[in-house]
């Protein structure tokens, strides 16, 4: 129901703003909005088309891992933690391995691997779901972990900063890591409170503290490197790990006498089917966002926030980067465009340019993930997924602003 109201609101607000624009003399406003519907629907299909090959590849690899027993080994290894974080999932269920693969891919910034493994996890959780059109607690927790977007290697952002001539492209690395860690911890805590999961259980608490320590070690390690070394290490590590996972699954299949090629083809067929299923959901959410943005409502929201901050007598320097923060839950490509625009207009080494990069790396595209993940299994009632995801995003935004002032203010 929440997505239903949000989607309707996109169009109603857009129409109201279009009428205001027309009254102020903008006779092209309705054409802009209508054009955005065609552009957004085309973009949604192109995204799905682009996902088809990637989904086929990674679901094929995952199928090899399933038949070789690798996924079950991962599930058993992670059972002590995941059975407490996802109490409704049976112990040692194969979905635990898929969840781990997805989280690991996200942490390494490997989006091409994260989405297929995430969709595989959703399909496995749907098999346990007694109400097929309603999201379960494990699905929501998993979704929030994705929307909070814990990434320890933000390779793309660092590459963009280098291309825009930043003096130190990697100077946002530690701030991004700190902000995304806050967003992830906030997402886990908020969702756990909502689902009445006791996060003070020794195993869970130790895991969260261990995660903080792990990120701290990475921050310290990369802090000892110069920018060229950091870029080389991050790129090399992420790609070596990715290729290592593929090789591990294939060799495990060979060792277990699995017909690796046939298993891959079987999984790849599932990838094509999944890509087709998500098209209507992507079209719906991207068209709604496109209409909202084309009407000028997004600009008005940003101007309103800027005015409110200034009236309170606070430092409003961060407002220039807010378009990236506001766009991020709605559209990944839109937020990326806002980040690049901020670096172009203000400079990559300006406060706004750096903060926009931290915003881009601190959370993920909540509504896109909702549309793709829930759409792949035909979930229509997301329950508290939207609220928890957006609250985690808000925590990430607040953390990003705070960290930016600490490092660059």
Residue ranges of each PLM-predicted region?
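Short glycine/serine/threonine-biased micro-segments
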Residues: 12, 58, 67, 107, ...
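Hydrophobic alpha-helical segments, principally membrane-spanning helices and signal/leader peptides
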Residues: 35-38, 45, 94-96, 131-139, ...
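C-terminal transmembrane helix pair
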Residues: 113-114, 121-161, 166-196, 322-409
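Generic signal for short, ordered secondary-structure residues
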Residues: 100, 104, 139, 230-233, ...
């Amino acid at each position: 129901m929440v997505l239903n109201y949000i989607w309707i609101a996109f169009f109603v607000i857009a129409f109201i703003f279009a009428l205001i624009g027309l009254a102020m003399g903008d006779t092209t406003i309705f054409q802009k909005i209508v054009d955005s519907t065609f552009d957004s629907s085309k973009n949604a299909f192109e995204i799905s088309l682009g996902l088809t090959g990637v989904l086929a590849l990674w679901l094929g690899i995952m199928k090899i891992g399933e038949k070789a027993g690798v996924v079950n080994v991962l599930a058993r290894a992670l059972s002590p933690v995941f059975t407490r974080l996802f109490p409704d999932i049976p112990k040692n269920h194969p979905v635990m391995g898929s969840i781990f693969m997805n989280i690991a891919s996200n942490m390494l910034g490997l989006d091409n691997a994260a989405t297929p493994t995430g969709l595989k996890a959703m399909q496995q959780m749907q098999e346990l779901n007694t109400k097929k059109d309603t999201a379960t607690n494990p699905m929501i927790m998993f979704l929030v972990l994705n929307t909070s977007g814990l990434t320890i290697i933000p390779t793309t952002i660092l590459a963009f900063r280098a291309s825009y001539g930043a003096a130190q492209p990697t100077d946002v690395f530690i701030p991004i890591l700190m902000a995304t860690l806050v967003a992830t911890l906030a997402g886990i805590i908020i969702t756990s409170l909502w689902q009445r999961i006791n996060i003070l259980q020794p195993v869970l608490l130790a895991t969260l503290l261990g995660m903080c320590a792990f990120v701290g070690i990475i921050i310290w390690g990369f802090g000892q490197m110069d920018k060229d070394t950091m870029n080389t290490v991050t790129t090399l590590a992420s790609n070596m790990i990715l290729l290592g996972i593929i090789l591990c699954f294939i060799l495990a299949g060979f060792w277990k006498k699995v017909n690796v090629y046939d298993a891959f083809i079987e999984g790849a067929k599932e990838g094509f089917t999944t890509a087709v299923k998500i098209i209507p959901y992507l079209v719906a959410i991207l068209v709604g966002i496109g209409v909202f943005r084309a009407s000028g409502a997004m600009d008005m929201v940003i101007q309103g926030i800027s005015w409110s901050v200034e009236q309170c007598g606070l430092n409003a320097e961060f407002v220039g980067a807010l378009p990236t923060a506001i766009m991020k839950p709605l559209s990944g490509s839109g937020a990326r465009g806002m980040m690049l625009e901020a670096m172009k207009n203000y400079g990559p080494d300006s406060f706004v340019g750096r903060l926009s990069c931290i915003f881009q790396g601190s959370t993920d595209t909540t509504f896109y993930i909702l549309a793709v993940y829930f759409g792949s299994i035909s979930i229509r009632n997301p329950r508290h997924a939207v609220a928890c995801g957006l609250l985690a995003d808000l925590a990430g935004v607040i953390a990003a602003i705070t960290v930016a002032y600490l490092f660059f203010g």
